Amino acid sequence: YKHNGPCYLRTSREPVENITTPDDEIEIGKAQVIEKGCDLTIVATGMMTILAHRALAILREKSISATLINIHTIKPLDKETVIESVRSTKGRVLVCEEANYVGGLTEAVASALVEENNIKFCSVAIFDKFGQSGLTGELLEAYGITKENIASKALELVKR
């Protein structure tokens, strides 16, 4: 990709499925809307985008439609896409990241939405705990970072 300047690339240990195509444009600072819905916005990054995408199937069974936004660039954050989507989904937003919410995507999205009215905000992330070592699947389960938990938090958000 064309970018003059420093960058940080974070990858997962395990292989993950593709939910985008090789033809999809990736522009630094521009989010990708994977799916559009009307009940809530799910903002995810990295492998969490895959888990959130899987959670959409659970939500569909409950007649909930969600917009899924893939944030491949946290800084600069595509505030415009996030804010526009949250406004169109009744102010409901769920942020998903497999990292500490402090200083990460959760905090960046919260900051972007601070001046918006009537926001219902929730996060699936690691909440300021000491890290552990282990297999990826075991760690995700231990921290509640699962498609089931994403769907559960989304349902709670829609019911508020």
Where are these regions (language model features)?
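Internal gly/pro-rich beta-alpha loop/helix module
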Residues: 1
